[in-house]
Design a protein with these regions (language model features):
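DNA major-groove recognition helix of helix-turn-helix/homeodomain DNA-binding modules
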Residues: 50-68
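Generic recognition of short, well-ordered alpha-helical segments
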Residues: 7, 49-50
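Helix-turn-helix/homeodomain-like alpha-helical modules used for DNA recognition
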Residues: 72-74
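Short alpha-helical DNA-recognition segment
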Residues: 20-38
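A short, Lys/Arg-rich alpha-helix, primarily the initiator
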Residues: 1-18, 56
Length: 74
């Protein structure tokens, strides 16, 4: 897994900004609820390992399509 849980809030917001997605849009793309994405961004919950894998697979697809560039520190 290449997403570090402690960098997650920064990471998930950066993904949404670059892809011009709302929390609801991102939730739909990765198969979770809006409330889940909202809780992640507000530091109420960290994603499960399964959710992290879903996010990584989605981000990998977007990177391959040239739609997403991530900072090296992630």
């Amino acid at each position: 897994m290449w997403i570090k849980r402690y960098d997650f809030v920064f990471f998930i917001k950066e993904v949404r900004v670059q892809l011009d997605l709302s929390q609801e849009d991102l939730a739909r793309e990765i198969g979770v609820s809006f409330a889940t994405v909202n809780r992640w961004e507000n530091r109420r919950f960290l994603p499960s390992k399964m959710a992290l894998r879903q996010i990584e697979m989605y981000c990998d697809r977007m990177i391959k399509l040239g739609r997403l560039l991530l900072p090296d520190k992630l």
